[in-house]
Amino acid sequence: MSKKPVLGIMAAGMGSRYGGLKQIDPVDPYGNMIIDFSIYDAKQAGFEKVIFIIKKAIDEAFREGIGKRIEKYMDVEYVYQELDVLPKGYEVPEGRVKPWGTGHAILCAAEAIDGAPFAVINSDDYYGRTAFEEIYRQLTTEQDGATYQYAMVAYDLYKTLTDNGHVAVSYTHLTL
């Protein structure tokens, strides 16, 4: 493996349901944000570079609230998830203002990823250190004869639900 794994953090969400930039709101009495715990765990697992995938509109608030602190511990790069960054032949539908999602975030970050093995997380979800250790191990382990390598850290659905309100979750069905 010639390049070290990088961590992409999707933080372009506008917080429309939440009512603000959830990415930069503290979650404990010490002012830590969920993203702080993720970056700490990722660093402990071996990641040395983080790519923040953000909207240009939140750049200043994000750099002030998160980036400047993280730059002391990790290599940091910022990329913008802008709606008009699309493959040839596609265009933004009239009235669309929200970011497209994970695949689009990765497309916007492709140049910064630069062929390195990578993992992508949401800025406002907590994953735990084990998730970062497992994905880092996967990204740094050569797979004999594999043209492409894919991995996903998944959780039992019942462990992702809460009694404290609505949670949007995805469901993955693995077919071998």
Residue ranges and their predicted role:
Residues 172-176:
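Conserved small/polar residues in nucleotide/adenosyl-binding loops
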